[in-house]
Curated annotation (Swiss-Prot):
Residues 18-72, 398-485 form the BTB domain. The modification Phosphoserine is found at residue 270. Disulfide bonds: none annotated. Keywords: Activator, Differentiation, Meiosis, Nucleus, Phosphoprotein, Repeat, Spermatogenesis, Transcription, Transcription regulation. GO terms for cellular component: nucleus. Its main location: nucleus. It is found in: Nucleus. This is BTB/POZ domain-containing protein KCTD19. The gene is KCTD19.
Amino acid sequence: MEESGMAHESAEDLFHFNVGGWHFSVPRSKLSQFPDSLLWKEASALTSSESQRLFIDRDGSTFRHVHYYLYTSKLSFSSCAELNLLYEQALGLQLMPLLQTLDNLKEGKHHLRVRPADLPVAERASLNYWRTWKCISKPSEFPIKSPAFTGLHDKAPLGLMDTPLLDTEEEVHYCFLPLDLVAKYPSLVTEDNLLWLAETVALIECECSEFRFIVNFLRSQKILLPDNFSNIDVLEAEVEILEIPALTEAVRWYRMNMGGCSPTTCSPLSPGKGARTASLESVKPLYTMALGLLVKYPDSALGQLRIESTLDGSRLYITGNGVLFQHVKNWLGTCRLPLTETISEVYELCAFLDKRDITYEPIKVALKTHLEPRTLAPMDVLNEWTAEITVYSPQQIIKVYVGSHWYATTLQTLLKYPELLSNPQRVYWITYGQTLLIHGDGQMFRHILNFLRLGKLFLPSEFKEWPLFCQEVEEYHIPSLSEALAQCEAYKSWTQEKESENEEAFSIRRLHVVTEGPGSLVEFSRDTKETTAYMPVDFEDCSDRTPWNKAKGNLVRSNQMDEAEQYTRPIQVSLCRNAKRAGNPSTYSHCRGLCTNPGHWGSHPESPPKKKCTTINLTQKSETKDPPATPMQKLISLVREWDMVNCKQWEFQPLTATRSSPLEEATLQLPLGSEAASQPSTSAAWKAHSTASEKDPGPQAGAGAGAKDKGPEPTFKPYLPPKRAGTLKDWSKQRTKERESPAPEQPLPEASEVDSLGVILKVTHPPVVGSDGFCMFFEDSIIYTTEMDNLRHTTPTASPQPQEVTFLSFSLSWEEMFYAQKCHCFLADIIMDSIRQKDPKAITAKVVSLANRLWTLHISPKQFVVDLLAITGFKDDRHTQERLYSWVELTLPFARKYGRCMDLLIQRGLSRSVSYSILGKYLQED
């Protein structure tokens, strides 16, 4: 009868909770029975118009038992394995009746209730239910209303990999694999098991849940299985399919040493099994895997395909507007499939598609469209473009994919122990600030994540995977975690038991321990990325030893804001008796690991992308094997049947950022015939040769400065050091005081002070990343502008203080921002260099006027270059003109967009400091 009554609960009478990625619905009538709980206080405060779910940064698997108790006021039998973690949740949520029940259970006054189906519903829920819920991004209209319903975990395949990715009603095992592991062991990915591909990760379907042990071995070269492991036959069968000799031998060795068989009964490897090594197997190009994946789907699921590229044209990506891409983007934050990494692979891609049948026709059309002759964007790009800034607070909800599992937590939790995100061997951003890939065991990471949340270890009472867990702890390189494991009583008992069984020391028992008191924070946060947002809830300070009847708590909710500016202000509290870690500054000081560079850019992890400056000439043969030694016209003939009419005009325009060391100024390069041009990073690079510079015949041989005596520095010292773009691991190197108490060097000028000649701004701000999810950022910017009065005429909008902002995202890619900054620096530097060198005021005025007219689009980039190089002291030759013209024409639109974003940043109060230099005052008569 109870369930029958529950079936009549309307959607409006249900409260929805997202607990670490598990979704739960509780009827108002049930939750109202616990009026003192934080769940009721926060949920009942929601208005009917809000229709929001609450996010709780806690273990969703354990919350299943809380959810069951809310329905039945009983404890399920399966909860006995994790009573300590359940007690922690009940205490934090202020569920006093549940705390009393747990106390009675310890005293033998309460009996556990055996449930008929004590399994996560995520393992058996209808796909139709999931499909509807996911596509509309809001709670289902028909939530399951049964005490046996223990929560919906948005878990692949019932989340990430259902239709259209998979059309099946059966459970499918899956695994996230870093692409560097796939490159090392190509047999892991086949045409049949590949589910999706991103720039850093491949998602594959597995035959069994034991596949995680295979991946663990390939990562650590150790077979680490649970105690009394009984599925060795299933594991061995999966290993034989992969044919990786080292893996095969390791499993055979394990069987022999665990008593499953003896050396005399274990048959030797057959000649065809495991005979080849992974290194000898050819690694498939990305485009073969990506395109082979797409052609499995109907055109209706793909929608309109399009191909995107980096500015140099070497890296190609394919995406579309169909339901398939929309579905993946909702989960991974990106839906671009990588195709190529070098110019030579673009040739190979064309040849590959030429041999494909009509199934690949939509892809051919997309590539043909991409390769058609295009002109650069018009200079006046701001008419059809809107500057946007996304603010990421510490309460940003991050989806973390680990092996065969995924979790949801907050950015603040991940930043508590910066060693996690500072570990490039294990951590990869799929989409910066949204989805994170961790190269580890998914089941073990659940316990690691609980430690990050609570500051202490909570392991099941019958935990059996100590060797694997110890290995995982060591590889995360978190001293506090290692210390917590060393102090764990269950771990001590296990080591003593193993020592008594075997005198050989287990290397995994030797942990590197650094004494450090763990901290504990609990937050409920709003998910700013979902259509259905989450309201923040915070736990009140309490102690592990606080009696349940004395524990109290209050909830703090943030005000409603525009969707573009949603953020939360956390109230940081301690739930454990251990104090916060000594020397633990603000959350912001832990940001160094937020953007660990996964090695995309060669040997210099802090440098911009290194791209080959290669010019594709239609009439010349390549002298190297990369690209292929065939005429370009022959390549074009391969795609002639694709109706490429103007193929003779088809050429790539590489734009390269190279660097000899991480601390040197980046050099931008542009194609001109078969040569590359240096970036005009300073005006000296374009002035006349000095005698000393002629001794260096390199690309920058003409970069000698003029032979003038420098005069006194201007009042404003331009902030133009050889500043490198940083990776997030550098964040913690900044001084905490500078972050918490930023002081502007100079106030913004009054509008009356700003003349029409322009202003140079130096702006320091929270880390700014691109909209493409790339893991690089800028923390300071030099901006040339003529529109400072716009900032004075605009009232700053309500905005979080910089201390509450972890990072920002502009509506530009990181590559576009990189070149935009260089253009701003170039314009500022040619002006300030003229002032520093005490040029005649007529020359300085000419330079200032040219920059102003270029910025306001009163002259073209070509005319700007001609007039600039005609000024005395600049190198004026045809080669220099063409190089500089190409560079300005390409970078100026990006600079104008970046300047507009920076204006918006200042207006919203997101800058840390702003200083300026008014150019007109340098031209005044003495």
